[in-house]
Design a protein with these regions (language model features):
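N-terminal acidic, glycine/proline-rich low-complexity segments
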Residues: 1-130
Length: 130
């Protein structure tokens, strides 16, 4: 369900930031280090999440993600407090829908937009075969 896992910044895409060697790319490279380290410690995956970046990308080009209607709620108590619950099949809320959720993302389109809009870099040749 969490499409942001598909666009998590991996080592090779993160290394491009370092090689661009601008003030902004260096900043993004540095702030993604903690996410990279935490994901390695907890999941043994060398990626840094980019949840907020995907949201911004959606506002710039809504064809980047595919959406489906569903009933979505946020848990307010207990061990799952703060987690979003998506009733995908409408089993618990009689097929009522109050929002849409992203179920897929175009990874290549996302990275092309990310590098072009933020760093003015065309990385098409680097991501097309990804």
């Amino acid at each position: 369900l969490d499409v942001t896992n598909k666009i998590a910044l991996d080592g090779s895409m993160r290394e491009i930031l370092r090689m661009l060697n601008t003030k902004l790319s260096t900043f993004v490279y540095n702030i993604t280090q903690e996410g990279m380290d935490e994901n390695w410690r907890s999941r043994r995956k060398a990626v840094s999440p980019m949840h907020d970046v995907l949201t911004v990308a959606y506002f710039l080009d809504n064809s980047i993600v595919k959406l489906k209607p569903a009933y979505i709620d946020v848990v307010t108590e207990g061990i799952a407090r703060g987690q979003s619950i998506v009733d995908i099949g409408g089993h618990w809320n009689e097929n009522k829908c109050n929002a849409k959720y992203a179920y897929d993302v175009d990874v290549v389109k996302f990275y092309k937009l990310f590098y072009k809009e933020i760093f003015n870099e065309d990385i098409t040749d680097l991501v097309e075969g990804k």
